[in-house]
Swiss-Prot record:
Phosphothreonine modified-residue sites: T174
Any GO BP annotation: mRNA transport
Disordered: annotated segments: 1-27, 73-189
Protein name: Protein Rex
Amino acid sequence: MPKTRRRPRRSQRKRPPTPWPTSQGLDRVFFSDTQSTCLETVYKATGAPSLGDYVRPAYIVTPYWPPVQSIRSPGTPSMDALSAQLYSSLSLDSPPSPPREPLRPSRSLPRQSLIQPPTFHPPSSRPCANTPPSEMDTWNPPLGSTSQPCLFQTPDSGPKTCTPSGEAPLSACTSTSFPPPSPGPSCPT
């Protein structure tokens, strides 16, 4: 039989002692000890007092302020009178009405734009001599109007349009073309 070499057993007593308890029953003590040690170290490093030096104050005294002298102007009711008046005005039988909200437009109605487009009025039936040419140049017919071009009948010729060079009667001297012609229509004086 070959000889087996025997290994010498190390005894657990020769191991260097650990700084914390090793038994499982003392786990609670281990955690609390380490926590308090760490906290104490951190507090000391930042300059705060350690947990061991902390003494809880027995009683904190709140300062007593004397009542304020009444500074109100003569003729002004006191707060007690105001609160009594408010209490008497509110009836306890009916609950206070909620604040009324402005009526919201329904979703079915089309939303009105905040900026209204300008409305153009057709020129009045004044003679053209009194109307300055700037008004006639800037007037545009409404979009939905079905007005026809400015046609008029003269006894000697057929239908004729109002042109700057042509002569036209006083009643038919407004330009309805869109956009307006560059030189304004001239009217006979």
